[in-house]
């Protein structure tokens, strides 16, 4: 199944949460928590401005991004991957290599 986000929406596949603490302790269950990083799978055409023009998004397909855990809407699995749909404004940062 393919999904194309509209306007300023972004589809993100959440990355696996770290299973070890900084001290090397293996974390399980809720202690591991949910990752707040993900890979951008698809982006909309852009945000529609008050004057009717469309501003392209800053994030691109393939970017690794950081977002707040409470943001985004979970969607059914797409190609066996659970994805989130969120507005670009809910993304806090792009991880640069």
From Swiss-Prot:
Q: Which GO terms describe its biological process?
A: chaperone cofactor-dependent protein refolding
- Residue ranges annotated as transmembrane are none
One MF annotation (Gene Ontology) recorded for this entry: unfolded protein binding
**Location of this chain's protein in the cell:** Cytoplasm
Keyword hit for GTP-binding: no
Q: Which UniProt keywords apply?
A: Chaperone, Cytoplasm
Entries under InterPro entries matching the protein: Chaperonin_GroES (IPR020818), Chaperonin_GroES_sf (IPR037124), Chaprnonin_Cpn10_CS (IPR018369), GroES-like_sf (IPR011032)
Q: Which Pfam families match?
A: Cpn10 (PF00166)
Question: What PROSITE patterns does its record include?
Answer: CHAPERONINS_CPN10
* CDD domains recorded: cpn10 (cd00320)
Q: Which Gene3D superfamilies match?
A: GroES chaperonin
Q: Which GO cellular component terms are attached?
A: cytoplasm
- Judging by the UniProt lineage, the source's domain of life is Bacteria
Question: In which family does this protein belong, per the annotation?
Answer: Belongs to the GroES chaperonin family.
Q: What does this protein do?
A: Together with the chaperonin GroEL, plays an essential role in assisting protein folding. The GroEL-GroES system forms a nano-cage that allows encapsulation of the non-native substrate proteins and provides a physical environment optimized to promote and accelerate protein folding. GroES binds to the apical surface of the GroEL ring, thereby capping the opening of the GroEL channel.
Could you describe the subunit structure of this protein?
Heptamer of 7 subunits arranged in a ring. Interacts with the chaperonin GroEL.
- Which protein is depicted? Co-chaperonin GroES
């Amino acid at each position: 199944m393919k999904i194309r986000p509209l306007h300023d929406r972004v589809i993100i596949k959440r990355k696996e949460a770290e299973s070890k603490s900084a001290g090397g302790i293996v974390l399980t269950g809720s202690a591991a928590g949910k990752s707040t990083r993900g890979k951008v799978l698809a982006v909309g055409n852009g945000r529609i401005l008050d004057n009717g023009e469309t501003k392209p998004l800053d994030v691109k397909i393939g970017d690794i991004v950081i977002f707040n855990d409470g943001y985004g809407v979970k969607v059914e699995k797409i190609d066996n991957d659970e994805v989130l749909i969120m507005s670009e404004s809910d993304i806090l940062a792009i991880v640069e290599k």
